[in-house]
Amino acid sequence: MSGGFYNVECPDCENEQTVFGKASTEVACAVCGTTLARPTGGEADLLGEVIETVEAR
């Protein structure tokens, strides 16, 4: 995965949220607070299911 944006589904509440692929901070679900992405120094570790890649318009 490159450093694009991804729509990720929360494994707990099924909320769909857009996450940056190279997130430098932990990203939590806006609804329930479950961690969706963890920084790894490069590509973020996406913990939810990636629904789609968000393309530039």
Swiss-Prot record:
Zn finger (C4-type) location: 10-32
Keywords tagged on the record: Metal-binding, Ribonucleoprotein, Ribosomal protein, Zinc, Zinc-finger
Keyword rRNA processing: no
Domain of life: Archaea
HAMAP family: Ribosomal_eS27
Oligomeric and partner information: Part of the 30S ribosomal subunit.
Annotated family: Belongs to the eukaryotic ribosomal protein eS27 family.
Protein name in the entry: Small ribosomal subunit protein eS27
Organism per entry: Halobacterium salinarum (strain ATCC 700922 / JCM 11081 / NRC-1) (Halobacterium halobium)
